[in-house]
Amino acid sequence: MSQDDLEIDLDAIQRRMDGAMHALRTEFGSLRTGRASASILEPIHVDAYGQQTPLNQLGTINVPEPRMVVINVWDKGMISKVERAIRDSGIGINPVVDGPIIRLPIPELNEERRKELSKVAAHYAEQARVAIRNVRRDGMDQIKKAKSAGMAEDDQKMWSDEVQALTDKAIAAVDKALEEKQKEIMQV
């Protein structure tokens, strides 16, 4: 067995953990916090030109005020379809059509809804932690295979410590992101 077979690809492990963090940030971005953000519209697709098209590909999305999102739809014939897609999306915002522009006034969240969103954020964070732990498990499995292929005990310990350090760092980043998101959600 060659020396390369006994190496553990820490970069691949790091990339997979970073992917879990990116997915978490995307999920957090879709949570409506009472503050305007273009990211709340990312999951919305519009039936345009015979296919489901992401809303951000049909017009420009701006946030001119803290509680207002403005969509300038490029094809004026799509305004009613965009409005319907927003209404049907379940994000809890009623679009207001103002000529060629669609305005989305973001209502304030009540305390009960804030707590509910905080729990949803915690659920997303737990999913990210599970994904990171699964990556850790895969890394540890690589180390076990390398050990059975002749890796020295000291090398096994070193690689295990490296994988654990990456895991601890990624879990800490998830916890920090969750804390920040919950603070943002609970802020009145």
Curated annotation (Swiss-Prot):
Recorded GO MF terms: ribosomal large subunit binding
SUPFAM superfamilies linked to this entry: Ribosome recycling factor, RRF
UniProt keyword list: Cytoplasm, Protein biosynthesis
Compartment list: Cytoplasm
Signal peptide residues on this chain, from the entry's feature table: none
Annotated Pfam families: RRF
UniProt-listed CDD domains: RRF
Gene Ontology cellular-component annotations: cytosol
InterPro entries xref list: Ribosome_recyc_fac, Ribosome_recyc_fac_dom, RRF_sf
Family statement: Belongs to the RRF family.
HAMAP family given in the database record: RRF
Name of this chain's protein: Ribosome-recycling factor
Organism: Cereibacter sphaeroides (strain ATCC 17029 / ATH 2.4.9)
Taxonomy of the source species: Bacteria, Pseudomonadati, Pseudomonadota, Alphaproteobacteria, Rhodobacterales
